[in-house]
Each structure stands twice: as C-alpha cells, then as structure tokens.
Amino acid sequence: MSFFALGVNHQTASVELREQIAFNAERLSNLLAEQRHHESLKDLVVVSTCNRTEVYAMAEDAESLLKWLADANNIDVKQLIHHVYRYENAQAITHLMRVASGLDSLMLGEPQILGQVKSALALSKEAQTVSPELNSVFEYAFYAAKRVRSETAVGSHAVSMGYAVAQLALQVFSKPEKLTVMVVAAGEMNSLVAKHLAEMGVAKMIICNRSRERADQLAQEIAHQVEVEIIDFSDLAENLYRADVVSSCTGSLHQVIAYADVKTALKKRRYQQMLMVDLAVPRDIDPKVESLDGVYLYGVDDLQSVIDENLAQRRQAAVEAEVMVNQLATQLITHQKVKEAGSTIHAYRQHSEEISQRELTQALEALHHGGNPEQVLQQFAHRLTQKLIHPTSMLLREAAKAESPDYFEWLQQHLQDVFDHERKPKR
C-alpha cells in the first residue's frame, strides 16, 4: 500500500470540469459510507472546495482513485485523465502539507483551506474510511500548517479586499467585540467583508440593501457568529451614526453617502471616529468626507496598493514556508521508515527465534536419545549458523548481480562495520 494524492484544482481544470466532480457533504458522506465495504479502496479522504477536488488514500495504485473519482460523478475517465495530478508517498505528503498551509491556494496563504481539510478528514472519520496510518499523515499535515502560519508571514498580510477591510478595522479599532459594522449593499464583495468581520467577533452587523431577499440571505450566513439587523436602503443616512465601520459597494452610478450625511452622523456620535471603506467604482462615498476630523476614508486604490504590497510579502514568505514544508515532510517520511524498519526488525527477530527453537528442539531430542553432547552441540551451532546467515548470503549474491554497484558496496560496508564491532574487545 502507498499513500496517494490525486485530483484537480484551479490550475489544471476549468470551472466547468471542477463543477462536475465537486461533492457536497451529504453526497460525499453517503459515498464514503458505501466505500468502506470495498477492500480495494476503503481508506480515503476527499477534499472538495470551489477551487479543488482531491482524493487522498492508502491504495495499491493511483488508477483505482481516478476510476473512483470518475465513477462517483458519472463521467468518463478520459474526461479527467489530462487534468488530474497524482502524487505518491513523499510527494503526496508534501502536497498535502502545501495544501493545508495555503501554499497551493488560488489566494496564496489563505487560512480557510486548513479548516476545509480538517472538515474533510472529520467527514471521512464519521464514515469510517480513515485508518490510523492515514490519520497520522493528516494530523502531521495540520501540525505543519500550524508551524507555517505561526513561524512565517505567509498568512499575515491581507491579500483580498474583504480580508483587507477586516484587518484595517483591527488597526483603527483595537477591540472588535465592541464594533458595530454597516455594509451598504450585500453583493459578493461586501458579503466577504461581512463574513471576515463576523469571524473577527464584531458586536453587530447592520445590512443595508435594496433587495430584502439578498440581505436575508447574507444575514442567514453570518447569524451564527454575530447579531444582525437589516435596514431599508432609504434609511441609510439616518442610521449612519450607529456604525463604527461602514463598507459600501453598491454599483450605483451616483454617490449614496453624502458629505452632509457623514457630518451629521459624526455629530450624533459625539465625534467618535469612524472607518469608512468605499469599494465601489464609481465611488459611493463623497471623497470630501476625508476632510472630516474623526473619519478614516479608504477607497479601492488605497486598499489595492496595500494588497499588492502584502501579496509581494506573502510570496517572499512563501519561499521560507516551502523550505519548512519540505523539511517537515522529510521528518515524517523518516519517521515512517523508522517505524516500518521496526516492524521488519521485529519480524526478523521472530523468524530467527523460530529457527533457534527448532534447532534447539532437534538438539535436545538428540541428547535425549543418547547422542554425544559435544557432537550434538557442534551440529546445533553449525546448522543454526547456516540457517541464520543464509538470507544474508543470498542478499549479497543478488546485490552482486544487480546493476547498482552502490547498493552492493553499501551492503558490504555495513556488514564490515558489524564484523568490526563484534571483534572489538568487550569491557
């Protein structure tokens, strides 16, 4: 059995193909529950996100994983064959560590992928398709990801608008748990802003949107993390004073937050500072607002320059992170080899003990039947020696015939080291 990683991601497959082989939790749970009864492939974890679908498994070959992935999604293997990547053992371990650390993500260093991989492992555990060996590989990958995030700067710089706004709020306000945030428009960009700020632990989220349906949808997505209030778009100006952070991204052709509205809001707030972020083009917020004392106004260009600089810093940090991942992968592989060697040594000892017991039984029987003790002991020693050295002798002969002289020389040298050690006088 080998450890394999096989799949597709944003670099190897179109979104149309990724959609075809994506799994939701319920369907995947049912498939895994069925799979645990198949001896040929019953030890696997499937990671499925919008940017990747990957199968990690202990298996005889990668082809069985490819066939399973195709069959599970009712598509021909030929549709996948030119888009999948596959890694085995050391390369598969390194790949899993890179994925969990965010080094293989579309957004370099993104933190969400680690949680997604952990959820994938948990789902497979529920379906009983995770052996102790497979589990240990994943747990070590999580350890590697934690080391990468804590010891390098690969995830410490905002590289998305939503995350950048959240980080900006932390810089302006030191205690997020006391903040009230207003998102003006509940589209894709502000949804990310709302989710990042909700995860950060803000006190309240006010959603101001023209469409009540979209506002309700966003509210449902974050309600488990933060108190949510929805207001009509027509009530925007009179509620501005309640927000410590305002993020606006309406797509309107005209400004929706006027200078006078912000000035009035500041007065109602007794001039407590406000962070206002304008993610819209054309702009939603009157740029003259920046002149008001207590208002921090940031636009798309301001944030983009920060993101570009941060992305460069992440890329630089990623070089250090890659070195760390390779070192940790090597450590795990070495540990696995030592463990495997321990099992082999135990089996070898047991085999030698069985030979010794058989020869000893034969010698005792000879003595019992009146055999000459000296001859019996000599025969016992000779037969035991022959049987114990026979496998090593055969190994040396085969190594000498092989086309790899390095292996034969290595074997000779190690045997010589053993001889030299045995010849040393015992103290």
UniProtKB/Swiss-Prot annotation:
<dbReference type="Pfam" id="PF05201">
    <property type="entry name" value="GlutR_N"/>
</dbReference>
<dbReference type="GO" id="GO:0008883">
    <property type="term" value="F:glutamyl-tRNA reductase activity"/>
</dbReference>
<feature type="active site" description="Nucleophile">
    <location>
        <position position="50"/>
    </location>
</feature>
<feature type="binding site">
    <location>
        <position position="116"/>
    </location>
    <ligand>
        <name>substrate</name>
    </ligand>
</feature>
<protein>
    <recommendedName>
        <fullName>Glutamyl-tRNA reductase</fullName>
        <ecNumber>1.2.1.70</ecNumber>
    </recommendedName>
</protein>
<dbReference type="InterPro" id="IPR036291">
    <property type="entry name" value="NAD(P)-bd_dom_sf"/>
</dbReference>
<feature type="binding site">
    <location>
        <begin position="49"/>
        <end position="52"/>
    </location>
    <ligand>
        <name>substrate</name>
    </ligand>
</feature>
<dbReference type="InterPro" id="IPR036453">
    <property type="entry name" value="GluRdtase_dimer_dom_sf"/>
</dbReference>
<dbReference type="GO" id="GO:0050661">
    <property type="term" value="F:NADP binding"/>
</dbReference>
<keyword id="KW-0560">Oxidoreductase</keyword>
<comment type="pathway">
    <text>Porphyrin-containing compound metabolism; protoporphyrin-IX biosynthesis; 5-aminolevulinate from L-glutamyl-tRNA(Glu): step 1/2.</text>
</comment>
<dbReference type="InterPro" id="IPR000343">
    <property type="entry name" value="4pyrrol_synth_GluRdtase"/>
</dbReference>
<dbReference type="GO" id="GO:0019353">
    <property type="term" value="P:protoporphyrinogen IX biosynthetic process from glutamate"/>
</dbReference>
<dbReference type="InterPro" id="IPR036343">
    <property type="entry name" value="GluRdtase_N_sf"/>
</dbReference>
<dbReference type="InterPro" id="IPR015895">
    <property type="entry name" value="4pyrrol_synth_GluRdtase_N"/>
</dbReference>
<dbReference type="InterPro" id="IPR015896">
    <property type="entry name" value="4pyrrol_synth_GluRdtase_dimer"/>
</dbReference>
<feature type="binding site">
    <location>
        <begin position="110"/>
        <end position="112"/>
    </location>
    <ligand>
        <name>substrate</name>
    </ligand>
</feature>
<comment type="subunit">
    <text>Homodimer.</text>
</comment>
<feature type="binding site">
    <location>
        <position position="105"/>
    </location>
    <ligand>
        <name>substrate</name>
    </ligand>
</feature>
<comment type="similarity">
    <text>Belongs to the glutamyl-tRNA reductase family.</text>
</comment>
<dbReference type="Pfam" id="PF01488">
    <property type="entry name" value="Shikimate_DH"/>
</dbReference>
<keyword id="KW-0521">NADP</keyword>
<dbReference type="InterPro" id="IPR006151">
    <property type="entry name" value="Shikm_DH/Glu-tRNA_Rdtase"/>
</dbReference>
<dbReference type="InterPro" id="IPR018214">
    <property type="entry name" value="GluRdtase_CS"/>
</dbReference>
<keyword id="KW-0627">Porphyrin biosynthesis</keyword>
<comment type="function">
    <text>Catalyzes the NADPH-dependent reduction of glutamyl-tRNA(Glu) to glutamate 1-semialdehyde (GSA).</text>
</comment>
<feature type="binding site">
    <location>
        <begin position="185"/>
        <end position="190"/>
    </location>
    <ligand>
        <name>NADP(+)</name>
    </ligand>
</feature>
<feature type="site" description="Important for activity">
    <location>
        <position position="95"/>
    </location>
</feature>
<dbReference type="Pfam" id="PF00745">
    <property type="entry name" value="GlutR_dimer"/>
</dbReference>
